From Swiss-Prot:
Record-linked Gene3D superfamilies: Vaccinia Virus protein VP39
Coiled coil: none
Record-linked InterPro entries: DUF938, SAM-dependent_MTases_sf
Native organism: Xenopus tropicalis (Western clawed frog)
Name recorded for this polypeptide: Methyltransferase-like 26
Family classification: Belongs to the UPF0585 family.
Length: 203
């Protein structure tokens, strides 16, 4: 099983916010996690939220193997085997029916992928979420053109050195993208390590 130190640090704080969007009275809350990484997040969420039926996804085969190992290690009956999913491709290739998901989760992907991946994520959410469903994203963001603190500014510079198409998105740009996909930015939650959770709800 792969272990990412950042995932170990942030999985608890993220869960505290995420659980507010998983109705404990619902028999099954169907969720897709896009860019699941090592599998630490989905394993942690699934253990804490037994009615969350989670479908992880990853492009990287080593990460998919790690996700499967976490599922096996914790005997997680509410997590499916990981799917190969490229969010830059049409939502019709993702393997879900329209309006079939309560929740889509995306942690630390937006700033380290090309814009087509984020655009595809939002388009997919607009089609696949049920009315009232939530797109839940986590990562560093600038707000109305202002990126703070200096460590995030430096991080953004380093990202663009690695790939000019990468970089930290502004919340206003994501809000505009959400609007075109039939969603709205409902809430923004400040998190440890200068990150944020953004909650987009489908109309």
């Amino acid at each position: 099983m792969l272990v990412a130190a950042a995932a170990d640090r942030n999985k608890g704080p993220i869960l505290e916010v995420l659980q507010q969007y998983v109705d404990p009275a619902a028999p099954k809350v169907r969720a897709l996690e896009v860019a699941s990484g090592t599998g630490q997040h989905c394993a942690h969420f699934a253990q804490a939220l037994p009615n969350l039926h989670l479908v992880p996804s990853e492009l990287d085969p080593h990460s998919r193997q790690s996700i499967s190992a976490y599922i096996s290690h914790w005997s997680l009956s509410n997590v499916e085997q990981p799917r190969t999913l490229d969010s830059s491709k049409s939502w019709e290739t993702w393997g879900f029916s329209p309006n079939s998901l309560h929740l889509i989760i995306c942690i630390n992907m937006i700033h380290i992928t090309e814009p087509s991946c984020t655009q595809g994520l939002f388009k997919g959410a607009g089609h696949l979420l049920m009315p009232g469903g939530v797109l839940f994203t986590y990562g560093p963001y600038s707000v109305n053109g202002i990126l703070t603190p200096q460590s995030n500014v430096d991080f953004n510079i380093s990202l663009k050195r690695r790939n000019p198409a990468w970089g930290i998105w502004d919340t206003s740009d994501l809000q505009n993208l959400a609007t075109t996909c039939g969603m709205s930015l409902e809430r923004m939650v400040d998190m440890p390590a200068n990150n944020k959770c953004l909650i987009f709800r489908k109309k």
